[in-house]
Amino acid sequence: MANAASGMAVHDDCKLKFMELKTKRTHRFIIYKIEELQKQVIVEKIGEPGQTHEDLAASLPADECRYAIFDFDFVSSEGVPRSRIFFVAWSPDTARVRSKMIYASSKDRFKRELDGIQVELQATDPTEMDLDVFKSRAN
């Protein structure tokens, strides 16, 4: 189904991998890419359950936009193990203006396809995705 604002479709695999992350916890993160020629969002990379936020940050290109889902496990201030599903809108300052516009205009529609996102994080460089940022946003 295409997005009226940006004309982007969402590949079925995007939702399937998200459901696997959410229900089976078979992935730590998913990186999504917009294929401009096919006008659709596709899965670019899957993170294994043992990987961390550092692996996610290292997997994002330095000069291209992406969307990512991150399953963040943490211990609450009460000492209770918790988990939050983050949506990361990665838009580095060095990305092309056209790319930033396409990702920005498609974001809300894409997020609606992924039922169960709990926290959104906008990041323009890896320092905006360090552990303290995830912890502070998760509570």
Swiss-Prot record:
Transmembrane segments: none
Matches recorded under InterPro entries: ADF-H (IPR002108), ADF-H/Gelsolin-like_dom_sf (IPR029006), ADF/Cofilin (IPR017904)
Any matching Pfam family: Cofilin_ADF
Main location: cytoplasm
Subcellular location field: Cytoplasm, Cytoskeleton
Name of the molecule in the record: Actin-depolymerizing factor 3
Residue stretches in coiled coil: none
Function as written in the Swiss-Prot or TrEMBL entry: Actin-depolymerizing protein. Severs actin filaments (F-actin) and binds to actin monomers.
Positions of post-translational Phosphoserine modification: S6
Listed SUPFAM superfamilies: Actin depolymerizing proteins (SSF55753)
GO terms for biological process, alphabetical: actin filament depolymerization
Protein family according to the UniProt entry: Belongs to the actin-binding proteins ADF family.
ADF-H domain location: 5-139
GO cellular component term, pick one: plastid
Induction section of the entry: By the root-knot nematode Meloidogyne incognita.
Keyword tags: Actin-binding, Cytoplasm, Cytoskeleton, Phosphoprotein
